[in-house]
Amino acid sequence: KHDATKSDLFDRFEAEVIDRFKQYQVPVIELKKETPKEAVCLVFERVNTGGVALNVFELLTASFAAEDYQLRDDWNLREQRLKDQHPVLRSLQNDDFLQAISLLVTQMRRREALSTGATADSAPGISCKRKDILKLEVADWKAWADRVEAGFVRAARFLYAQKIFKARDLPYRTQLVPLAAMFVDLGKDGETEGARQKIARWYWCGVLGELYGGAIESRFARDLPEVVALVQGDAGEPITIQESSFQSGRLLTLRTRNSAAYKGLYALLMRDGGRDFRTGEPIEAQTFFDDKVDIHHIFPEKWCKTAEIKAGTYNSVINKTALAARTNRQIGGRAPSKYLPAVEKAAGVGAERMNEILRSHCIAPTELRGDRFWEFYAARAEELLQRIEGATGKTITREPEMFRAGVVAEAYDEGPEEWDAEEPLEQALS
């Protein structure tokens, strides 16, 4: 029997629901086979308002999968080896690895073009920008991945020699890219002491000149051939060394690990002979990890507050150095004239030996033992500037009165950088 009520209900459902679905227009972006990979990546980023971003590694993984090659599986194994064996590489990212490969692949193509008569202007450029990474093929990965992995291992060993042991203390993760590529390209030529000195100068110019923040792919592309040529004696100073500059007043604003130059200067002090307060030995990897060496105040925070010294001044890198956790506990909040005898007793050394250790940290013993903060501050600032000059080979213009009591500019004292919550503060002793 016909049920008019049910028929009406179905007609209404068809009109109000089904027909609306038929008329609904779904936005579609058509990507043809000839659409460049970088365009696909850009489209995804623009329309994907949620979820995981499609980075260059993800897109290349999909591209390689079309050729039955599992890029992610290969990378995961390499990543595990690199990060398990080298703590300084634990912040390394998959696109860092791809950038290093891209630099080497494009450099090889440029050299091949130049060798067959192309001019410098017409030969393809060296690049590690996204569009160039997306042009990599499975054959490129297979040809270079092992060598680039070895290059990052050599980069890690180079950093250990510079007293940079952990990823947390790495001034610029990005600088790993050209560094690893250089070691790959140089091969055995990069193993000599002379080569390492030249590479180290380039490295410290980049760190202390603070040149590797922001968009730096173009700098990578210049660094690789220019530093390799410098090592091989075929060219003058790389542009990175030429552009590096350190202003003396920058010491006053280096207060936390937010600054690459802060972490770099801390490592530089250890590299150039900073000795452990307790053992008197150079701070090597084992000492660094076993004794939990970290950056601590020389004149303790509690003492500085009592002396009415502003936080922007006592938190500067000028008043900090690498100390073992045990030594820092002995220091507490006491004046240097009080804590130094305790440190000497714990270390089993006399005042003269302790003075030698203090000098290895660019600390003037007489000023520190006399609790003369401003005399210590000015003397240490000058010593630090000399260390920076030695590492970069660049002369720093001095402002002699900048580090004196009552002269430190308010602009430097006020608004200190955000405190690094991971950096331990002194535990005041009663």
Give the residues covered by each predicted segment:
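Polybasic, low-complexity binding patches
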Residues: 313, 331-359
